[in-house]
């Protein structure tokens, strides 16, 4: 029990709340077994506005999703639908659009364009003595505080939302600072921009690792090679190819 069925957290669906918060603990007590330290009740969900039914044919098969999108992306697509403690609707018809907007064009594109600039402008070797912009530090600190608070309270939807707001802000930072123009003009601020991007990306990788362990392992491996100066501009990460 201690290894395969620990009592730290008992996760149940709303429809069996009574049985698992009243009867199940009573059965455990009568058997002399430890009670759950916490019980998390997740909400019920519909699929594209309908109850999930084999007859209707709208059952979501996680294995099919993993085959189509990869296990990490499938996990994200499900967890990012709505807060787990609430009832909600899974927009399965929109999975491809959400994959492309959040993963391919979102975090995937941010990492790709940032790493390409680091390789192209500095051969991947950044001077760590350069400062990191305070606004990026402050943004990361705020995001991390909210992320950790949500994660510790099993608010995974909210934790992911915080990370993807940070991703959008880092994308906006690139567009505002225009590192390509700084490189063309030999502006010394370029190193500060690249270091700030690296700092932000390392935070993103750490935050997303519990949700996307395989993809973030790929990103960390790529980043290690980049820092060693082992990569060329044509060596793409290709984390989330468009669908």
Positions of predicted regions on the chain:
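Basic, alpha-helical terminal appendages of large translation-related enzymes
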Residues: 138, 145, 149, 154-155, ...
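Residue-level signal for inorganic ion chemistry
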Residues: 20, 107, 163, 213
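Active-site cores that bind ATP or allylic diphosphates and position pyrophosphate for catalysis
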Residues: 1-14
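Long, charged, glycine-rich C-terminal linkers/tails
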Residues: 37-44
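Catalytic adenosine-cofactor/nucleotide-binding cores of aminoacyl-tRNA synthetases and other
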Residues: 44-131, 224-243
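Short active-site loop/helix that positions an aromatic residue
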Residues: 21-31
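Secondary-structure capping and boundary motifs in well-ordered enzyme cores
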Residues: 13-16, 65-69, 95-106, 132-139, ...
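Short acidic alpha-helical/loop segments enriched in Asp/Glu that coordinate divalent cations
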Residues: 116-133, 153-162, 174-184
């Amino acid at each position: 029990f201690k290894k395969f069925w620990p009592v730290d957290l008992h996760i149940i669906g709303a429809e069996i709340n009574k049985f698992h918060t009243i009867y199940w603990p009573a059965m455990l007590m009568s058997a002399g077994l430890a009670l759950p330290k916490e019980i998390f009740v997740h909400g019920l969900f519909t699929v594209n506005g309908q109850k999930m039914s084999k007859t209707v044919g709208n059952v979501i098969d996680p294995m099919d999703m993993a085959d189509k999108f990869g296990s990490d992306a499938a996990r994200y697509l499900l967890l990012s639908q709505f807060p787990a403690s609430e009832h909600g609707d899974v927009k399965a018809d929109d999975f491809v659009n959400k994959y492309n907007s959040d993963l391919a064009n979102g975090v995937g594109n941010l990492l790709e364009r940032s790493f390409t600039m680091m390789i192209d402008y500095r051969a991947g070797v950044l001077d760590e003595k350069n400062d990191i912009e305070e606004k990026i530090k402050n943004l990361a600190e705020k995001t991390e505080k909210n992320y950790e608070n949500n994660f510790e309270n099993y608010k995974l939807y909210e934790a992911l939302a915080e990370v993807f707001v940070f991703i959008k802000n880092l994308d906006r930072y690139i567009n505002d600072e225009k590192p390509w123009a700084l490189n063309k003009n030999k502006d010394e601020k370029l190193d500060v921009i690249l270091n700030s991007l690296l700092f932000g990306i390392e935070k993103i990788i750490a935050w997303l690792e519990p949700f996307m362990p395989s993809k973030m392992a790929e990103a960390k491996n790529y980043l290690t090679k980049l820092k060693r100066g082992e990569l060329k501009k044509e060596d793409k990460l290709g984390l989330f190819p468009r669908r």
